């Protein structure tokens, strides 16, 4: 297995439990893990939607790890996922203050994951060029 496929699968296995923690049983897991009380069905719906996005990304990353033609797209989606989640956490720290340590750990992993995924994209796929759309 090459390093790109390994990192895609490694990330999927790391993110999947977080997805389940957010959405499988939010009224049980969120108070226990994150000190977040679910006070309405709307809040459960939001966390289950987040779970759905995380699971969908996980599926795509595993497919990309197994299918060369989708690997670069899967790496880009991994980079966007880590960068977007990390940027949101940084924004929250700036606007809301420091969260519990588990979210600082998540931020550290997102920064690391973003850097590794971008490195894999640039090192492994710099030989590829965009097709010429117009010929003169």
Language-model-detected regions and their locations in the chain:
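Membrane-helix boundary connector in multi-pass membrane proteins
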Residues: 87-103
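Aromatic-anchored segments of alpha-helical transmembrane domains
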Residues: 17-18, 81-90
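Juxtamembrane helix-break-helix junctions at the cytosolic face
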Residues: 59-74
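Cytosolic juxtamembrane helix and N-cap/initiation of the first transmembrane helix
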Residues: 1-14
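Core segments of alpha-helical transmembrane spans in multipass integral membrane proteins
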Residues: 42-63, 80-84
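Hydrophobic transmembrane helix segments
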Residues: 15-41, 45, 51
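Single conserved hydrophobic/aromatic residue that forms the stacking wall/gate
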Residues: 127-136
């Amino acid at each position: 297995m090459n390093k790109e496929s390994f990192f895609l699968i490694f990330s999927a296995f790391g993110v999947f439990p977080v997805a389940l923690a957010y959405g499988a049983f939010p009224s049980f897991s969120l108070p226990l893990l994150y000190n977040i009380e679910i006070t309405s069905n709307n809040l459960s719906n939001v966390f289950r939607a987040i779970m759905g996005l995380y699971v969908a990304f996980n599926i795509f990353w595993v497919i990309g790890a197994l299918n060369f033609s989708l690997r670069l797209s899967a790496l880009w989606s991994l980079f966007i996922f880590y960068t977007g989640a990390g940027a949101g956490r940084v924004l929250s720290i700036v606007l809301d203050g420091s969260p519990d340590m588990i979210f600082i750990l998540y931020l550290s992993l997102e920064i690391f994951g973003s850097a590794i995924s971008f490195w894999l994209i640039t090192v492994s796929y710099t030989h590829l060029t965009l097709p010429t759309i117009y010929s003169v």
